[in-house]
Amino acid sequence: MSKSGNGNGDKVLYCSFCGKSQHEVKKLIAGPSVFVCDECVELCNDIIREETHETHEETEARLPTPKEISNFLDEYVIGQQHAKKVLSVAVYNHYKRLQHKSEDGVELGKSNILLIGPTGSGKTLLAQTLARILNVPFAMADATTLTEAGYVGEDVENIIQKLLQKCDYDVDKAQQGIVYIDEIDKISRKSDNPSITRDVSGEGVQQALLKLIEGTVASVPPQGGRKHPQQEFLQVDTSNILFICGGAFAGLDKVIRERSDKSSIGFSAQLKSKKSSNDEVSKVLGQLESDDLIKYGLIPEFVGRLPVVTTLQELDEAALIDILTRPKNALTKQFQSLFKMEGSELEFRDEALIAIAKKALERKMGARGLRSILENILLDTMYDLPSLEGVNKVVIDESVVNGLSKPILIYEQDEKKSASGSKD
């Protein structure tokens, strides 16, 4: 026991670990025959915290295989199997390249990705889900808001600032993150010939993005401050950031047809151009070549920095119904969870799900339109439900989706009556 006298008859207590007296520390904690000071407790906490952090980093270091990545994507994204396979391999190779620096002197190039597919086909969700499984920072940018430096609009380096914000300005983490740039087709060059006038939101932005995507050291103001000459900038190397660009590329199928069907002229060519079902468009996009993207309006250097290109198919009715019900975070499950918090069960009948999918197809918004349709259907019920008592179940059928009737509310007393009636 760490005790001793101080000459006045009072016993002075000492820490059993560092030997400091009770007068030298803020707090001395007593245990069975031992004492420990606040400084030693803090030191022990630091040691445990450091060891836990190292163990956590070792666990995180394991890179999932392409199959594991694809299986994880299956839990959140419906369909698009070919795109999932392409993405899984590209992402696996990218992070394997970072983990194992080449020992034989072979420099491995970065495989940035271009996703081509209609609105609501799952481009953004695929990129977000990839970042989740790999546990890396993820930032999104809209290409339509970007302009060249010096013009009114968003500077391309703001993309890196968004990435830094997602990881609390940890530069090392940000340098291994994923950036998704949406609406990339909207910055295509306005014509085949380079214009003598400035194309502030077209070719100029492609040139600015080109440096960022291929790898440069971007100067970013710390903690979201504005740039000014006296400020210290954070230096972020973008060489190892994975860039995924996405866009609908409306009319790209026509560019491909023009190239592949040059032999078809006259009446037969007109017939072919009118025939544009979803399946046929998907087949045509499957024949995509780099020259088609250049013809569409992307500059050759930009196309060259996006070596992995994959297309996503437009979602049909069956896929939209699956999206409503199957994924871990399916929309119907989300709303059912909200209603459960109010003590009510939410039921969607099969014909209601079909009607919702048909509405989304009519709006040509793909999966993106599903939430707004559901919000609209359930708005009045979500407004009234917290004020109502004894609502056990809310039922949505086809007539509710089509606006012909209101959701069916089943009260607790109604269920009791039906239960007692069945007993009689």
UniProtKB/Swiss-Prot annotation:
MF terms in GO: ATP binding; ATP hydrolysis activity; ATP-dependent protein folding chaperone; protein dimerization activity; unfolded protein binding; zinc ion binding
Q: Where's the ClpX-type ZB domain?
A: 1-56
The record's Pfam families line, in alphabetical order, gives: AAA_2, ClpB_D2-small, zf-C4_ClpX
- Keywords of the record: ATP-binding, Chaperone, Metal-binding, Nucleotide-binding, Zinc
For binding Zn(2+), which residues are annotated in this chain's numbering? C15, C18, C37, C40
Q: Does the keyword Membrane apply?
A: no
A Gene Ontology BP annotation from the UniProt entry: proteolysis involved in protein catabolic process
Q: Matching InterPro entries, A to Z?
A: AAA+_ATPase (IPR003593), ATP-dep_Clp_protease_ClpX (IPR050052), ATPase_AAA_core (IPR003959), Clp_ATPase_C (IPR019489), Clp_protease_ATP-bd_su_ClpX (IPR004487), ClpX_bact (IPR046425), P-loop_NTPase (IPR027417), Znf_CppX_C4 (IPR010603)
Q: CDD domains attached here?
A: RecA-like_ClpX (cd19497)
Say if the entry is tagged with keyword Iron: no
Residues that coordinate or bind ATP: P118, T119, G120, S121, G122, K123, T124, L125
Q: Name one GO cellular component term.
A: HslUV protease complex
Under the heading NCBIfam families, the entry gives:
clpX, PRK05342.1
* Known function: ATP-dependent specificity component of the Clp protease. It directs the protease to specific substrates. Can perform chaperone functions in the absence of ClpP.
Checking PANTHER family in the record gives: ATP-DEPENDENT CLP PROTEASE ATP-BINDING SUBUNIT CLPX-LIKE, MITOCHONDRIAL (PTHR48102:SF7), ATP-DEPENDENT CLP PROTEASE ATP-BINDING SUBUNIT CLPX-LIKE, MITOCHONDRIAL-RELATED (PTHR48102)
Question: What is its quaternary makeup?
Answer: Component of the ClpX-ClpP complex. Forms a hexameric ring that, in the presence of ATP, binds to fourteen ClpP subunits assembled into a disk-like structure with a central cavity, resembling the structure of eukaryotic proteasomes.
Q: Which family, according to the similarity comment?
A: Belongs to the ClpX chaperone family.
What protein name applies here? ATP-dependent Clp protease ATP-binding subunit ClpX
